[in-house]
């Protein structure tokens, strides 16, 4: 396989890390932000073009958020495991290990997606019942969920393919594929809903079709690349050792994300008791604040991948330098995004809801949570640093304790004593701060740069 680095790929093993981190991270952030915007377009279209059914249609799409989030986040975590395993193998210059991991990831994504699709048809109705979806919304929500779950093979395939591209330092190809499929998604939404007069079924079909296109585009690119991650149909099989390694790193990260989603469902249940205005305000604010999270999380993903390759290459000092620069550059990017969002908060909130009361309450959420993203940056970068070394269980358990444990306990014991929106919001900086301290302690205890110092090669970062 070819070893030259193309313009859209990043050489993580040599040269300046300072210049390369943002080249990796910013397309990842743009991809996540585009996904948010395309999802918002789904809601906007059913909310404006489904006539008398628009209220239940919007509610049906929203009601499925927690379920879809749990499933997709679980597998995105596993895809991160594939990213690390492939990056390690690339750093070791072990093309055979890369080949086994790549083909294992592709097959696992399709088979895992098929299993979820089939199981989902059986448990979709009970899951929606657990969430207490209103009777008038239930049939629409069930229809949307069943169609969406049928598309899980292609949805998961895209995420695993994107992880493969990122492992070689290519974040632009997944972004381009998503942009193409996203535009197609919007066009299909308009066609199905306006022309064919469909409701949530049209939006769900459009989403699945668009994901199929993005997955197909990346698959074709992988079959034609001259890099070591090239996919060959005859080699598509699961390698037991590769799968075990992928799951050992990815499953804790996936479970962490899934439990994280569950904790947020608990918080949402508390917000739901405060009335329609609070619900609308919180929803609008979330759509604003997630943009800053996408920015900081992109540097965490960059840190994981850079550390993964350099750890595989035995360049341990470069791993530590990657973590330090990820902090610095991530802090700069996060600070800028937080300041911009806070200064334009009321205008951005008005895009989702122009009610002055909704905007006022939404601003409370933004003013409380966005400054606390300094803690989020700390634990995301440090978690990414540990995962790059293959240490995944510890950050997952500590995040579950710090984020999930505190949030669930807060809603159960603190919120009942002062049932206000601000009381609910205080749990975010408290839980994020506690988690940051826990992860920092874990890094100080593990000290990966010292633990793996014996693997250091003669090749030094110039």
Question: Which residues does each PLM region occupy?
Answer:
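Short alpha-helical transmembrane segments in multi-pass integral membrane proteins
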Residues: 1-25, 86-151, 195-251, 307-372, ...
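N-terminal transmembrane alpha-helices
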Residues: 12-44, 48-52, 66-81, 85, ...
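Transmembrane helical elements of multi-pass membrane transporters/channels
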Residues: 23-42, 147, 181, 210-214, ...
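Helix-terminus/linker motif at the lipid-water interface of multi-pass membrane proteins
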Residues: 33, 37-59, 128-135, 191-198, ...
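Alpha-helical transmembrane segments of multipass membrane proteins
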Residues: 40-44, 118, 126, 160-164, ...
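Small-residue hotspots at the loop-to-helix junctions and early N-terminal turns
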Residues: 55-66, 141, 145, 204, ...
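Small-residue-rich hydrophobic transmembrane alpha-helices
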Residues: 58-118, 155-174, 268, 279-345, ...
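Short runs within selected transmembrane alpha-helices of multi-pass transporters and secretion channels
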Residues: 76-79, 148-166, 174-182, 203-218, ...
